[in-house]
UniProtKB/Swiss-Prot annotation:
HAMAP family, alphabetized: RNApol_bact_RpoZ
Highest classification ranks of the organism: Bacteria, Pseudomonadati, Pseudomonadota, Alphaproteobacteria, Hyphomicrobiales
Annotated organism of origin: Mesorhizobium japonicum (strain LMG 29417 / CECT 9101 / MAFF 303099) (Mesorhizobium loti (strain MAFF 303099))
EC number(s) reported in the record: 2.7.7.6
Binding partners and assembly: The RNAP catalytic core consists of 2 alpha, 1 beta, 1 beta' and 1 omega subunit. When a sigma factor is associated with the core the holoenzyme is formed, which can initiate transcription.
Protein name: DNA-directed RNA polymerase subunit omega
Family: Belongs to the RNA polymerase subunit omega family.
InterPro entries: DNA-dir_RNA_pol_omega (IPR003716), Pol_omega/Rpo6/RPB6 (IPR006110), RPB6/omega-like_sf (IPR036161)
Disulfide bonds: none
Catalytic activity: RNA(n) + a ribonucleoside 5'-triphosphate = RNA(n+1) + diphosphate
Length: 133
C-alpha cells in the first residue's frame, strides 16, 4: 500500500498541525485498545490513524472533541442549589438562601469620579526603595 502523506489528509483537516494532534491522539487510542476502522496491513498505529482520517472512517470533528475532552482536567457541572441552604452574607452572618434574593436587591455601590480617583492616588505614599527591584 502507498504511504499515507499529509496531502492525503489535508483536505479533511485544514490545519496540518491540528492533523498531527488528531492523528497522534487517535494513535494513542489505538495503542490503548480502541477498535480500528481500516485494515491494519502491517502498519503502525500513527499510519493507521492517518489512513482512518484520509478514508473518512472517523470524523475529524469527533476526534477533536474527544481530544479536548481527554485533555480537560476539571469539567464544570452546574448543579442547582438546594432550597433553604445556609450561606453567609457580606457581613458574615448566616442567612438562608431564600432570604439572600431580597438582600441582593438592597446592595448599593459607591460611585467615584475620575477626579476623585486621581486625587486619592496622588495622596498615596510611594513604597520605600529597596534593592529587590
Amino acid at each position: 500500500m502507498a504511504r499515507v502523506t499529509v496531502e492525503d489528509c489535508i483536505d479533511k483537516v485544514d490545519n496540518r498541525f491540528e492533523l498531527v494532534l488528531l492523528a497522534g491522539h487517535r494513535a494513542r487510542q489505538i495503542s490503548q485498545g480502541a477498535q480500528i476502522t481500516v485494515p491494519r496491513d502491517n502498519d503502525k498505529n500513527p499510519v493507521i490513524a492517518l489512513r482512518e482520517i484520509a478514508d473518512e472512517t472517523l470524523s475529524p470533528d469527533d476526534l477533536k472533541e474527544d481530544l479536548i475532552h481527554s485533555l480537560q482536567k476539571h469539567v464544570e457541572v452546574d448543579e442547582p442549589e438546594a432550597d433553604g441552604e445556609v450561606i453567609a452574607d457580606q457581613t458574615g452572618a448566616a442567612v438562608a438562601a431564600t432570604e439572600t434574593d431580597d438582600a441582593e436587591d438592597n446592595i448599593t455601590f459607591d460611585r467615584m469620579t475620575e477626579e476623585d480617583l486621581l486625587a486619592g492616588i496622588e495622596g498615596l505614599v510611594p513604597p520605600e526603595k529597596s534593592d529587590d527591584y
